[in-house]
UniProtKB/Swiss-Prot annotation:
Role summary: The RecF protein is involved in DNA metabolism; it is required for DNA replication and normal SOS inducibility. RecF binds preferentially to single-stranded, linear DNA. It also seems to bind ATP.
Keywords for this protein: ATP-binding, Cytoplasm, DNA damage, DNA repair, DNA replication, DNA-binding, Nucleotide-binding, SOS response
Pfam families per the UniProt record, alphabetical: SMC_N
Binding site for ATP: G30, L31, N32, G33, Q34, G35, K36, T37
Sequence similarity: Belongs to the RecF family.
GO BP of this protein: DNA replication; DNA synthesis involved in DNA repair; double-strand break repair; SOS response
Localization (cell): Cytoplasm
UniProt gene name: recF
Name of the protein: DNA replication and repair protein RecF
Entry keyword annotation includes Nucleus: no
An annotated GO cellular component: cytoplasm
Amino acid sequence: MYIDRIYLKDFRNLTENLIKLDNRLNVFVGLNGQGKTNFLEAVYLMGTASSHRTNADRELIRWNQDRAVVQLYLVKRDEKLKISLEINKKVKKLEINDVPQERVSELLGNLNVVLFSPEDLKLVKEGPHFRRKFLDTELSQVKPYYHYLLKKYNHILSQRNNLLKELMTGNKSDTTLLEVWDEQLVEIGAKIIQNRIEVIDKLKILARLSHRQITDGLENITLSYESSLSDRIEEKELEEIKIIFRNKLVNNRNEEITRGYTLAGPQRDDLKITMNGIDIRKYGSQGQQRTAALSLKLAELEFMKSEQGEYPVLLLDDVFSELDNKRRHRLIDIMAHRVQTFITATDFFNLNEINTPSIKVFKVRNGLITRYKSL
């Protein structure tokens, strides 16, 4: 899988750019604030149907413009796809091979991407939200149906929480509707939990392999699903998860009415990361946390390959300055041989370190992306 070329117009600060890309390595060099990360954001958006930086579409449109356009030409096995997204201040319009699509979520399952940036340290050291988002984004790309489950679950959860608030304030007293929401929450929520457990079962093997390579076998990383429903939930079948979830809601009912929100479910769960048996979020050094984040991203890359039959596009946003030689060379080894990669940097790092048959280097300045004729 690789992007042959991409057209951007008025996306963030990017003016009008048509870029012919290398099918392996592409390096984008420029000072901060020139548009490098905006370019990666556009690619990420086309793969995941969402920005990793904002939920407000208007922020994606260049100042004083009415719309932004991102169009890319994707080569996927023997298939060629033209994917076009127009972002207005109120709506997004998507076309695939010039055929209008009803939902922007139809982007999912076409272009697969893995993004690694300095912000990914939050994946390890910050709260559970970042790790849930990591799992959900990955699952939505390889299983677009999962995105539908997640969207439906969040709608049901919102309705249930609204009802709990009304019961808390005394505006309502009948709990009959709560039982209806409970059953829907259980049906969808249990499937989300099961999907997350399945992906963690695969990721933990891949992450362990990557981590041992990076650390020369000195450290072992372990991933596990930490559920708000029950210990050892990963050992349960789908119907057992439903029973546990249902019972949890019944047992929590009085407290939930008192607090006005739902206390258990996949929205409260976490991906636990340990290194040599130690909770790395609480006790790991920043170097260990960064290594763990890199291991997770490399595992994500290999997981998508195993699920989709080809590697996703790898986006590296100013990460080379954050990595020591060993971690940098591990990334270089991967991208040089198998993966179309986009790297952003503020200066020319040692490109001679990269053993790849082809490379394109681009200059990014004031929203304009141009190719360097020579290094």
